[in-house]
Amino acid sequence: MAVFLDFKRQLKLWLEHIVHHVSDLQEETILFISFGPKDHRCSVWHSEKTVLSQATLQLFDFIDDQFSPDQLPDYIKIDVAYNLEKQSWNQIEQQVHHQFHNNHYRRGIGFDESCSVAFLEQEIYGKAIIRGLSYDKPNFFDEINLNYAIKQKYRATKPEIKLQSLQEVWTFDTYATFYENGQFINLASRYDANGIRAIASNKKQHFRGLIEKNAAFLHSQIQENGKFIYGYFPAYDRDIRNYNTVRHCTSLYALLETFEVQDKSEYWPKIVAAIQYALTTFYKEKDPITAFMIDGKEGELEIKLGANAAAILMLTKYQEITGKDDYLKYAEKLAHGILELVDPDGLTTHVLNYANYDLKEKFRIIYYDGEAALALLRLYQINQDK
């Protein structure tokens, strides 16, 4: 009960603090609360669009009704809407249509004047209301996903939304705070950093915590056979079925780098399994002194300059930390592979077809060149082979 009462006290103070910094909160706003356990997608409730004092009463009534005084949810986030703005639906569609990626729209959207149907930015992407099928096709609002999200979110029946019939919507920014370890942590508002927590005052401790937590996550994603759980789409928590050699190796390299900060002996069995998985699955020798890392689906296999570089960075970092040269011969053959992709003038070739080694793409990604140079330098530090 004491924790519950302290939570409400702090929330009241935070709302009082916010109102002094946002002039338009004296007018209409919407309060959102996102909450849930660690192993489940959060639920999101919001007040009516009304004055802050009335919205605050509605929020606290909801908290008293839904939360147990003896046990708060694991995750709680509060959003306060401001800059509520009526915009033409066509204007919003065009903004989304012309964005380079499908997750760059940073505002919440209400789909009627009273905002009885409203979604935060994070809900819009978490429920795939805005989608992009591929990098070269325009982004769009998915009507089926929107209406499915409405049915999931609201207890009361809402009319189905037909996007072609929409004339206007109400967009908004939010100020937000995240409740963790008995305190409220302010989150950034607007633009690229929207919804991201500010850096703690002790930056060294903050960054160390980030490194340790991300290392633990990477380690947890390595399966027994050494293959990573590649990732999840945030909408519907679906597994990403693709796999990528460069990301396998760079993820391992990143995990190995964390040993500069912390020595986790319990990580080694999975790290070794993941290195072995890379060498067994992707490593192919062209001749006795030259090797390449392959990538892609069966029938579309290719050789990437960046994949060889990433593998060398992974293997040399392992040797640097452990002092063991178990994988040195693999790194040296991969280095010969890189040299085959660099002409006498220093110009690189980025992608070959496998297994005929003919040109697929002269240039693909700008960082391949720097990655390859760094990999060769890291190997030179170990074997001094000019």
Where are the language model's segments positioned?
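Carbohydrate-binding/catalytic loop surfaces
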Residues: 227-244, 287-310, 348-371
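Eukaryote-specific, low-hydrophobicity, charge-rich regions
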Residues: 186-238, 260
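Well-ordered alpha-helical scaffold segments within catalytic/enzyme domains
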Residues: 189-204, 249-265, 310-324, 371-385
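Charged, amphipathic alpha-helical stretches
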Residues: 2-47
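Post-signal peptide N-terminal segment of secreted/secretory-pathway proteins
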Residues: 42-79, 255-258, 262-276, 281
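Long, well-ordered core segments of solenoidal/helical folds
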Residues: 155-162, 209-227, 268-289, 328-349, ...
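Extended, non-transmembrane interaction/recognition domains
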Residues: 48-209
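Active-site lining segments of carbohydrate-active enzymes
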Residues: 313-385
